[in-house]
Amino acid sequence: MSSEGEHNNSDLALRSRLIAELRGLRLDTRRLNSSLVERLRPFRKTDGSFKTLPDSRKKKHRKRTPDISVASTCTVLLAAITSGKYEKRHKLFETKSATEIFKQAVVKANWGSSGLEDGNAFTTAIVVRTAGFMVQRGVLPAKEVQALKHAHFKNNENVARKTLKQIVQSKAKKGEDSFAVADYPPKSTHAYWFVDGAIGAGVALPQSTWQKIASWASNEFHRQLIYVTAENDALMDPPSLAMAACLINRIRRLSDEERELASLSRMLPSLVELEVGIEQVFTKQSESGIWHRYFPLFHFPKGGGAADYCFSFEFLEAILTEFGTFVLRNPALLDRVKRVIRWCDTHELEFTDATGKKYRGWSSGGEVRSLAEGKSESWATASVHMFLTQLDRRISDLLDELVLKGFGIDRRAVTESSKKFEQMIDADLRFLGERPTTLKKVIEEEILKKAKALTAEGLIREGLPVPRSVLLFGPPGTSKSRLAKAMAEYLGWPLVTITPSEFLGKGVEHVHAQVDEKFRDLMDLRKAVVFFDEMDALAQTREGDEQSDGRGAGDLDITRQLLTTSMLPKLSSLWDQRRVIFLMATNHKQQLDPAITRPNRFDMLLCVPPPPWTSKSSAESLDGILKIPDPKKVERKLGQLAPPKSRTANRLNAFTVAEVGIFLHHLRRKTNQQTVLEALEQFTDPSEFAKAVENWAVTAITLRSQGQTIREFGKDFNESRRQYYPGEE
């Protein structure tokens, strides 16, 4: 074996091993994350907000100030929004919606966590980040969020009676001072939350402000990187290093998106430096799976010396957001992430209060007495779930990338263009549900536009709507494969083509294993078009077992068994995932196993007929698809020889586009002419051309394979179209 072949095999083995590890880790992550609502709901108070501890006492406030723990409530909101479980149907928010609770926290509540003053850097950063998530996830529009006015009664000039937009802009002007609580130094934790939220909420800041923040973040990163690398226990603060790296990367992403801020990237450490910093953070992970405490964010003014620290899961969530792929691709760091998951498994607390209400979740360890009593914290539990959700998302992103690479596809090289779809010759589907329409119109209106709208609005995480699967049937040569490619380009999604060889290449004895393997890969894809091509051999009924190609009934029984016992359930699972659009093409609709058309497999059964003669003979088709010289003159001559609605045109309606091209070149050769136009000019009488069509039609590819005359094929074709229409949810 050549060194190149050995290298490829080694890469394949490494990729397969990484895929297997990631799938296993994702299973554990989803198992832990599945109880988000059950863990957080017991902390919900009657007003819809969330208390910090099971036994949190009601705080004394003036009548017009609601008793809301803003930091805890917003952190729960962040976890719910990140996971997509913020709607009332998820039963985490029932008496009030997530948007109502957020507005109440922003407008009426005191932004003074743990005795801190209203509008302190810690609480403000959490509120602003929650606002950004609200906008980014489509929960609230940016203008509405920015216009929310903090109307708390206290006369704090920083926040009182100012809109959220004004608060963000006024605080950001102060640069790093905006991220300091009282007399404590500025913290990169507060800075990352604040900046991420401001960007997400669409609050514009001047370039000078960004330069201040970028300069401070770079200095903080380099300072902490030196301390951590030197193992200076007295000065190092790994959480601050992690958050500084995340802050810088967030600013870098902004500078890549906003042309007027492009110069910011020159002020920032390189991506390689940032990744070195992240590696250094993980070197300080304890054996338990999380990090020891270093410097506090602040001390509670009324807490008897108690302090608040950046919880490990808060900076881990930020690391995954900004450097997820880097972490998961690195075997050493991937093992560290697994250690974190083990901590989640072994450190979950359970507590039952005096009323019998049960609480499950995690504690940050900040409340020592509560930890000793086994009481979890709402915000810490929410932070763990934010980490789990982000880990799931980053694993899924990387699996999508790795699986596509296995198919020889790089998503970054995929471009979005509707040109190929627009250039496709349309086909009449007037019998479709008895409504006059066309093939392209049905596909564009029912599938492509809906999927594209969801992608544009960032709502694709909720899943693709019905219809998202199509069975394409029709004679060979009707551009079913080209249609799949055009659909993928229209959306800007990769096209993954699956043929029978993917399942049968290793022999019949390995068919089920191959089906399992390929569909595991397909289940890891998102925003992709999957095209099952040439699947007729795997979809035949017993009535179609005896074929003229010489295959025995036993062979076809095996392929039929493959479909019914392996592929069909997998198609249903792929449909349930709601992450891809998948198509299957067949030339033999009548021979399909009826099970394939059942609900939750194919939402829509569409005939892909030969386009009408007028479309096939158009200059656009002759030039763009068939590449015939002098297309306009050829179109004009064909219009004279086979005018619309003539008997000859009706015959030519049954020809595929490819067959029209073959026929025209057949005429050129038969008449010994140099061009198609010269060949057509040999026909002065339309009846002579009609006879040439009839003589050639008996050998046409489509008709020969169907074993039918033009008239018989057209009759059966029209009848079959009446039976199929778009599926409905």
Task: List the model feature ranges, each with a label.
Residues 22, 26-54, 91-114, 144-178, ...:
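Long, well-ordered core segments of solenoidal/helical folds
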Residues 288, 292-302, 346-369, 643, ...:
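Surface-exposed intrinsically disordered loops and tails
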Residues 384, 398-429:
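A short, basic N-terminal segment
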Residues 420-445:
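Dynamic helix-loop-helix/coil hinge segments at AAA+ ATPase domain boundaries and subdomain interfaces
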